[in-house]
From Swiss-Prot:
PANTHER family: CHLOROPLAST PROTEIN-TRANSPORTING ATPASE, SECA INNER MEMBRANE COMPONENT OF SEC PROTEIN SECRETION SYSTEM. Residues 957-971 have a biased composition (Basic and acidic residues). It holds the Pfam family SecA_PP_bind. ATP binds at Q84, G102, E103, G104, K105, T106, D582. Part of the essential Sec protein translocation apparatus which comprises SecA, SecYEG and auxiliary proteins SecDF. Other proteins may also be involved. Monomer and homodimer. The keyword Magnesium does not apply. PROSITE patterns: SECA (PS01312), SECA_MOTOR_DEAD (PS51196). Coiled coil: none annotated. Its main location: membrane. This is Protein translocase subunit SecA.
Length: 997
């Protein structure tokens, strides 16, 4: 194991050495030359011309990086460190740069962005929320504009026109969800002017910030665009009432109980519930039905299961909050609200019923994609985060991305203390309060990380209300009494009398009795515990001011995080991933100065205002004063910013002397990465700091995944909450539990990807063909329409014209009725004459007649109008069929695992069934399009002709598992070949005829 770790780190060190030689040294050599350039944009244009003439990006990297570094120096007052140049090169190579908090990932991205923007194909910088997208675009904008590059930013409220403009910019800052939804919406567009992504190279190069959060934590969350489904919602209220009446039982367990008890059992690990036979009978009685799981009642059974899941597995202020009468999901990884996101399969409606709020109509999926498959569509992708190395295997296996750990600019000196483990959650929280009180009294800033809104508010309440701590004092007192019961004498009697009123105890009351207590042993331990409890209560009574940062209090997020490093500051926050603001010791003078100027009416994000603030904070007052005059900033504001700077500087020295920011984790997360993200908030850029996690065996991680043997051992040994549990077995149990969950979640994500890959291949085929119809030339649209008519007519005819059956026995009346249902224009066709032909010839004759009827229909409407009708019809039919197909796949997937009981591989079965469903959908699309094109009535003001879009090459999708619209993109025409589809053969024949004419 050690050898493997050594090899991993050796590989990383070799990579870093390579970057120093190939990137850092050449860029540094160019620095003096670039500093003298009067026009950086002109120099950047020269690089662009070189690239257009054939120079590779790798060849242009040193000069592009040097220009970007100089632009940052001139317009932001920031210079890329050497290690940041390495980070930029890692991103350019399509890898993941692991960079610790405070190492300047935002600035690093500008290097790879500027280099890859030379292609003119657009670069997307992907962030986790709107605030970071806007902040980074405005903050780094001057660097790009200094090089002559345009910058776009997309927000949730951006209009289609604003989105289109932003995506056409050289650099686009956008959140992962907005980007994914724009892709899905583009593939639902019915005219080219509805598209917002670029027509050519819509997904060229993406740099994903917090890449582990997006590609791993959110990998299981599909992006879904949905429309209302036809389903009664009042039933959910009834199911919520029935769920309340059902009682939770215990599952069957070998050697304990043969049968499950109660009405249902719960599997928290898998977030699933199972009705017992008793529960099924009770539910049937309450519903007034028989056979809850019979086909006609399956919908009711599904709704009841979701109601029980909502009751047992989804908790208010942990998984969701209720705000303004709406159930809003809380992101389990970032602690942020996700308005607009809804749980699927009726679960959201079940939660709404449980909470008694208005139930929104259930939705049907119109388009969907997972982040896993969406980001794999990019020609090149890269990522950056503070924590990725632990997940390198997953990044390599699923995304083909290596992780490079970029060295810090200064060594990390943060002290990470061992975990403190308690038997119960109550004991753990008392210990956390004691630690906070101790650090607060010293003046050391504390950041407390919790995993849910509920826990953050509970801890806040304990700090606000000293009475909630009294049980801890009483427990400590009982332990001391027990340890000292054999002690005799007048002094002991005085002490016992004093201890009769514990709530009134003060530190000074206990001080005179210090000499009574021996220096070592149980009595000393109990005495120290009592003293600590008395002192903590005294500090709580004086008050511990603190800030709570969770999804309910997100409005002041940046301000709270920016000032979390000030002395005597206590901040309680839910998961810290993607908070985007550095915690600076002594407070953030730049943020305070920006807030001051904003209050005075200045735009804090305007680059000259930002530059002024940076110069002032850095003490470069002469340069700052020149900018102040230009911006109209008054002298008294300069004086106030100077005071802010000095206050923060003095406080920083005070905090450094106290040991820096101290991190308290109140629970181990399922993933070590999330724990490391919290730890990483302290010790930025070589600052001092410390961290410690408090764990209890009531925590979800330990309760669900820790070894039963360890818990049984603790029960036998009679551990209580007076002292933490220190045992190597416990420490190993925590590590194993996290590893077990990480492995399980990786397996789930791999399985999700395996199943989603089947859908992904089908989606690529449909979307590529759909894009061909939307953006292709008129002749290509006509070719597709004719191909569908041919396939449909031929397929219908072959059902009746069996070559194995004598022509006299063919059901021509049935054939006629079927064909006229699709193409009424064939009314006058001489069907009786078909008996004189062979089956194949008869089919060809019918196809030719249908094509003549189609040509006549085109002449009747005019070619431009016919093309517009074809586009409209094909796109609408495809969208409706695809919507239904997604629903069918969803139903298939829900039940496919039952086939495992029949000794069949569920995935292989899913693949076979999904392919069959896809082929059926394709046949349906062709049939419906043909029917619509023949039968559609066009009124006086019909469909407005769509102006033919400029020809855009669409990457050819492999027609798997079936050729979709009967045609492929036009190529040089070879003579007809055997083995081609009928549509392809006829297309080639038509092109051959045209060529001869």
């Amino acid at each position: 194991m050690l050898g493997l770790l050594r090899r991993l780190f050796d590989n990383n060190e070799r990579e870093i050495a390579r970057y120093y030689k190939q990137v850092v040294e050449p860029v540094n050599r160019l620095e003096a030359e670039v500093e003298k350039l009067p026009d950086l944009a002109a120099a950047y244009r020269e690089l662009k011309e070189k690239h257009e003439k054939g120079a590779s990006l790798d060849e242009l990297l040193p000069m592009a990086f040097a220009l970007t570094r100089e632009s940052a120096k001139r317009y932001l007052g920031m210079r890329h460190f050497d290690v940041q140049l390495i980070g930029g090169a890692v991103l350019h190579e399509g890898k993941i740069a692991e960079m610790k908090t405070g190492e300047g990932k935002t600035l690093v991205a500008t290097l790879a962005v500027a280099l890859n923007a030379l292609t003119g194909k657009g670069v997307h910088v992907v962030t986790v929320n709107d605030y970071l997208a806007r902040r980074d675009a405005e903050w780094m904008g001057p660097v790009y504009r200094g090089l002559g590059l345009s910058v776009g930013v997309i927000q949730h409220a951006s209009t289609p026109a604003e989105r289109r403009k932003a995506y056409l910019a050289d650099v686009t800052y956008v959140t992962n969800s907005e980007l994914g939804f724009d892709y899905l919406r583009d593939n639902m567009a019915i005219s080219p002017d509805q598209l917002v992504l670029r027509h050519d190279h819509p997904l060229h190069y993406a740099i994903i910030d917090e890449v582990d959060s997006i590609l791993i934590d959110e990998a299981r969350t599909p992006l879904i665009i949905s429309g209302p489904a036809e389903k009664a919602t009042d039933l959910y209220y009834k199911m919520a009432e029935i769920a309340k009446k059902l009682e939770r039982g215990l599952p069957a367990e070998p050697g304990v109980r043969k049968e499950p008890t109660g009405d249902y059992t719960v599997e928290e690990k898998n977030r699933s519930v199972h009705l017992t036979l008793q529960g099924i009978a009770k539910a049937e009685k309450l519903l007034g039905i028989e056979g809850l799981f019979s086909p006609e009642n399956m919908e009711l059974a599904h709704m009841l299961i979701q109601a029980i899941r909502a009751k047992e597995l989804y908790h208010r202020d942990r998984d969701y909050i209720v705000q303004d009468g709406q159930v809003i999901i809380v992101d389990e990884f970032t602690g942020r609200l996700m308005p607009g996101r809804r749980y699927g399969e009726g679960l959201h409606q079940a939660i709404e019923a449980k909470e008694g709020v208005r139930i929104e109509r259930e939705n049907q999926t119109l388009a969907t994609i997972t982040y896993q498959n969406f980001f794999r569509l990019y020609e090149k992708r890269a990522g950056m985060t503070g924590t990725a190395k632990t997940e390198e295997k997953e990044f390599q296996e699923i995304y083909g991305m290596d992780v490079v750990v970029v060295p810090t600019n200064r060594p990390v000196i943060r002290k990470d203390f061992p975990d403190v483990v308690y038997r119960t959650e109550k004991g753990k929280f008392y210990a956390v309060v004691e630690e906070i009180a101790e650090k607060y009294e010293r003046g050391q800033p504390v950041l407390v990380g919790t995993i849910s809104i509920e826990k953050s508010e509970r801890l806040s309440q304990m700090l606000k209300e000293p009475r909630l701590y009294l049980p801890r004092l009483e427990m400590r007192l009982e332990l001391f009494k027990k340890a000292s019961q054999k002690q005799q004498g007048p002094e002991w009697e005085r002490l016992r009398k004093l201890l009769e009123r514990p709530a009134q105890l003060k530190d000074e009351d206990l001080a005179p009795f210090e000499g009574l207590i021996p220096p070592k042993g149980n009595l000393r331990t109990a005495w120290e515990g009592l003293k600590r409890a008395v002192h903590t209560l005294a500090v709580l009574r004086q008050g511990i001011p603190h800030q709570v940062l969770n999804a309910k209090h997100h409005a002041r997020e940046a301000e709270i995080v920016a000032q979390a490093g000030r002395s005597k500051t206590v901040t309680i926050a839910t998961n810290m991933a993607g908070r985007g603001t550095d915690i600076k010791l002594g407070g953030n003078p730049e943020y305070l100065a920006a807030a001051l100027l904003e209050k005075e009416g200045f735009d804090r994000y305007e680059w000259k205002v930002e530059l002024f603030i940076k110069k002032m904070v850095a003490g470069k007052e002469e340069e700052a004063r020149a900018l102040a005059q230009e911006l109209g900033i008054r002298e008294e504001l300069l004086e106030r910013i100077r005071e802010i700077r000095e206050e923060c500087k003095q406080d920083e020295e005070r905090v450094r002397a106290l040991g820096g920011l101290f991190i308290i984790g109140t629970e181990r997360h399922e993933s070590r990465r999330i724990d490391n993200q919290l730890r990483g908030r302290a010790g930025r850029q070589g600052d001092p700091g410390g961290s410690r996690f408090y764990v209890s065996f009531d925590d979800d991680l330990m309760r669900l995944f820790a070894s039963d043997r360890v818990i049984a051992m603790l029960d036998r040994m009679g551990f209580d909450d007076s002292e933490p549990i220190e045992h190597p077995m416990v420490t190993r149990s925590i590590e194993r539990a996290q590893k077990r969950v990480e492995d399980r979640n990786f397996a789930i994500r791999k399985q999700l990807l395996q199943f989603d890959d089947v859908l992904s291949r089908q989606r690529e085929v449909i979307y590529a063909q759909r894009r061909l119809i939307l953006l292709g030339k008129d002749e290509e649209v006509k070719e597709a329409a004719i191909g569908m008519v041919e396939e449909t007519v031929a397929s219908l005819a072959e059902n009746f014209l069996n070559p194995e059956v004598h022509p006299e026995d063919w059901d021509l009346e049935g054939l006629k009725a079927t064909l006229l249902d699709t193409a009424p224009q064939l009314q006058d066709f001489p069907f009786a004459e078909l008996r004189a032909l062979k089956a194949e010839e008869a089919v060809e004759r019918l196809v030719e007649a249908a094509l003549k009827a189609y040509e006549a229909r085109e002449a009747e409407l005019s070619p431009p109008l016919m093309r517009a009708v074809e586009r409209f019809v094909i796109l609408n039919v495809v969208d409706n069929a695809w919507k239904e197909h997604l629903h069918n796949l969803d139903v298939l997937r829900q039940g496919i695992f039952l086939r495992g009981y029949g000794q069949k591989d569920p995935f292989q079965e899913y693949k076979i069934e999904a392919t069959r469903l896809f082929n059926e959908m394709v046949a349906f699309i062709k049939s419906e399009v043909a029917k619509f094109l023949f039968r559609l009535k066009v009124e006086a003001e019909p469909v407005r002709p769509v102006r033919e879009a400029p020809y855009v090459p669409v990457p050819e999708a492999k027609p798997e598992p079936s050729e979709v619209f009967g045609v492929e993109r036009k190529r040089a025409t070879p003579p007809p070949q055997p083995g081609l589809s009928r549509a392809e053969r006829r297309r080639l024949m038509r092109q051959e005829k045209k060529r001869k004419k």
